[in-house]
Amino acid sequence: MLPSAVAAHAGAYWDVVASSSLLNFPAAPGFGNLGKSFLIENLLRAGGAPPLGLPPPQHHGSAAALGAGAQVRSLPASPVPLKLCPAAEPVSPGGAPYGTRWAFQVLSPSADGARLPGRAPGDPDCAFQPPAPAPSKPFFLSAPPFYSACCGGSCRRPASPTAFAREESVLPLLTQESTSKVRRGILRRAVFSEDQRKALEKMFQKQKYISKTDRKKLAINLGLKESQVKIWFQNRRMKWRNSKEKEVLSNRCLQEVVLQEDPLSRSALGFPSPCASLWEVSQQHPSPGWRENSPEPSERLIQGSPGAEALPPEAKSLQGALYLCSEEDARDKNALTGTV
């Protein structure tokens, strides 16, 4: 058999398998005959009858084939490994090599090591075994060619948009549940009537801290809950403390302002008057008796007194101090110094 006939026979066989048996979809233009569509053998084969022993290739869609009563050949239910391998480059009679042709080959666990014609005998990746018997379950007819042929049909189609719930429909449910849980713990503010408020205020003036029994009685009389009465007393005590603190602070500020403006008002407010300085006292009493009765300097006292050498240092320091005293105190002091 000529190489051209062998190549034509192999090309027709793979076109039939890829188009009708494997995918049942019309092959894409130039996919199965990549690089060979311009050859004379392909043009003659496309215009004339197919070789003997092979059915004519079906290029119409699956709907037309099913409508005409043609039986679709299905693949095994188990994943069938597919392998992509480059075919050998057979030499044409003119000496020009054919282009490299890629094809999906179906491999099945069979001991038959037959090889396709037109393939290199030393290529281990291009071995062909007859496929297993077809089961009754058809192949994915509605699947695209890429997802059906890739990885032996194990690749899944992308999920439709309606397969999963939309986020917009899920988020409102979550937000409603979370907000409802949060709102359950929040207590609504009780609105008291004028009579209830007056009764509560009257009880607060009697006692700032209400007992449990009194609180229960007051709640029953006013038609309130014990928790409402308890919360009202807590808020009222806090308000009372804040008012007391503000009052004390305002009084202190007022006193400080008054003292800064008028120092003589200290006696009116009950504050003790500050002690007068020595200079003010000396200016208020300029009588000569004070000056005469004032002690002499420490040097003269130490030199004039006979027992000055035996005085301790504390007495010496006291003698050197300035004493402002009356005439009677000066006489008593002179008598004491004479006895010493």
Curated annotation (Swiss-Prot):
GO MF terms listed in the record are: DNA binding; DNA-binding transcription factor activity, RNA polymerase II-specific
Lineage top rank: taxon = Eukaryota
Under the heading Pfam families, the entry gives:
Homeodomain
Annotated region (Disordered), positions in chain: 283-313
Covalent S-S links between cysteines: none
Q: What is its main location?
A: nucleus
Q: Looking at the keywords, is Nucleus present?
A: yes
DNA-binding positions: 185-244
Where does the record say this protein resides? Nucleus
* One Gene Ontology cellular component annotation held by this UniProt entry: nucleus
**InterPro entries, from UniProt?**
H2.0_Homeobox_NeuralPatt, HD, HD_metazoa, Homeobox_CS, Homeodomain-like_sf, HTH_motif
Which Gene3D superfamilies does the annotation name? Homeodomain-like (1.10.10.60)
Q: Which UniProt keywords apply?
A: DNA-binding, Homeobox, Nucleus
GO BP annotations, alphabetical order: epidermal growth factor receptor signaling pathway; G2/M transition of mitotic cell cycle; gene expression; neural precursor cell proliferation; regulation of transcription by RNA polymerase II
Q: What family is this?
A: Belongs to the H2.0 homeobox family.
State the protein's name.
Homeobox protein DBX2
Q: Which organism is it from?
A: Bos taurus
Annotated gene: DBX2
